[in-house]
């Protein structure tokens, strides 16, 4: 997750500065992702590595993959290098397709798969990134109407179940696949803030206006 946050920050820094050193780092991160982080056989990104970039855990993080797909596309767009568009676009398309087929159940996205065992909890940030990720996939490949439908269905799930409708509240940290909240999770704490869901709202507004 660290490289992705660096990439996200460098993307916006390069957008406003066009600094050559920042561009160099963006390209380096994309190269590392394509050559070390992305697993083409499993069409997913690996999560934890040793110092030589060997994967050390069998974990498919569905939320990180759908988030990464649109973040990479955004960075490549801002980078403006055709070679990187050709290199990265097939990867982000594969990530989006794989998540749609293995993790989306028609209305929301499961959390992750750890050593073959799927965690079906619906985590607040995963649901937020799902809306952006599938809308991004549809914008890139408008023939894939299922991505548009998935983004709309996810948004309905969020409104009906992920949002805590109590006055002054926020989104539930997690609910089960039927939308029932887990009561032991706080609404806000150091690992739970409105970053992902706030960004989702702003991102969707920009994309559909």
Spans of features found by a protein language model:
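Glycan-recognition and catalytic cores of secretory/periplasmic carbohydrate-active enzymes
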Residues: 1-209
């Amino acid at each position: 997750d660290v490289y992705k946050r660096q990439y996200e920050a460098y993307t916006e820094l390069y957008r406003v500065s066009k600094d050559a050193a920042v561009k160099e780092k963006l390209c380096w991160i994309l190269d590392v992702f394509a050559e070390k982080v992305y697993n083409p056989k499993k069409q997913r990104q690996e999560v934890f590595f040793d110092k030589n970039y060997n994967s050390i855990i069998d974990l498919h993080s569905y939320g990180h993959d759908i988030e990464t797909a649109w973040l990479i596309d955004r960075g490549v767009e801002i980078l403006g290098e055709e070679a990187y568009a050709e290199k990265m676009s097939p990867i982000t398309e594969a990530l989006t397709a794989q998540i749609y087929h293995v993790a989306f159940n028609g209305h929301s996205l499961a959390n992750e798969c750890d050593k073959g065992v799927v965690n079906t909890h619906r985590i607040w940030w995963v649901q937020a990134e799902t809306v952006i990720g599938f809308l991004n996939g549809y914008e890139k490949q408008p023939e894939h109407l299922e991505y548009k439908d998935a983004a709309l269905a996810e948004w309905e799930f969020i409104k009906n179940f992920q949002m805590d409708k109590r006055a002054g509240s926020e989104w539930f940290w997690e609910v089960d696949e039927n939308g029932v909240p887990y009561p032991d999770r706080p609404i806000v704490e150091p690992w739970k803030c409105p970053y992902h869901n706030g960004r989702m709202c702003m991102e969707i507004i920009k994309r559909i206006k």
